[in-house]
A protein has these predicted regions:
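ATP/Mg2+ or Mg2+-diphosphate-binding catalytic cores
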Residues: 52, 56, 133, 155-183
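Catalytic activation segment of kinase domains across protein kinase-like and atypical kinase folds
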Residues: 82-109
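An alpha-helical support segment within catalytic cores of ATP-dependent transferases
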Residues: 26-77, 81-82, 87
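Non-membrane alpha-helical structural segments and their capping/turn regions in soluble enzymes
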Residues: 10-17, 121, 125, 168
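ATP-binding pocket architecture of kinase catalytic cores
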Residues: 1-34, 45, 52
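All-alpha amphipathic helical-bundle segments outside canonical DNA-binding/catalytic cores
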Residues: 136-146
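A glycine-centered beta->alpha junction motif in the catalytic cores
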Residues: 1-9, 25, 41-46, 151-165
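Active-site activation/catalytic loop segments of kinase-like enzymes and analogous catalytic loops
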Residues: 105-134, 147-165
Length: 183
């Protein structure tokens, strides 16, 4: 199983990217059982002022992503390091519970956020280059999906435990990034 630090290794990172590229360019069709474009609004507790604010921001992010444009391709949608496994020098994806047709930008943004690419600016920039997210328009779309990933998994964590520190941290980071964008 990969460790978060394995994405610092260019060879392992590129094997993971290759696995995602192969998935995204495949002819697979997934049922629409999980969509990051709306799941956050279904799990947010709008009687809680903080979660209500997060939901409203999520709605604005989805509006912006929709305005930019969404492509639907086969996506894994849960790309924390433990879902990448190495067997006989090959990288595989496991845990397909949330797979569905979605935008590849969510997959990559989710991978970056869940594996802390943001903690190393050089790694983040190199990895963005490796996946072809180079111009400002692509970076903007990627960043919106990154915020959406934080909102989705942050709310998900709070549903499991209302005191989940990682969930609160993800949501607070999403809010900070959103307000920095001044939407």
């Amino acid at each position: 199983t990969y460790k978060s630090s394995d994405f610092k290794n260019e060879n392992l990172r590129n094997k993971a990217f290759r696995k995602l590229f192969d998935l995204h360019s495949s002819d697979l069709l997934f049922a629409d059982n999980f969509s990051p474009l709306d799941i956050f609004s279904k799990i947010a507790d709008v009687s809680n002022e903080f979660e209500k604010e997060v939901k409203e921001i999520g709605d604005k992010i989805v509006d912006k992503i929709t305005e930019i444009g969404i492509e639907y391709k086969p996506c894994h949608q849960d790309l924390y390091f433990g879902n990448f496994v190495i067997h006989q020098d090959e990288t595989y994806l496991i845990d397909w519970e949330y797979s569905a047709m979605g935008d590849v930008y969510f997959d990559y943004a989710d991978l970056f956020w869940q594996n802390e690419f943001d903690l190393n600016k050089s790694l983040r920039n190199k990895a963005l280059e490796e996946i072809g997210v180079l111009d400002n328009e692509k970076i903007e779309k990627f960043e919106y999906f990154e915020i959406l990933s934080m909102i989705t998994w942050g709310l998900w964590a709070l549903k499991r435990s209302s005191n989940d520190e990682n969930g609160m941290e993800a949501l607070n980071k999403a809010l900070d990034l959103f307000y920095d964008k001044k939407l």
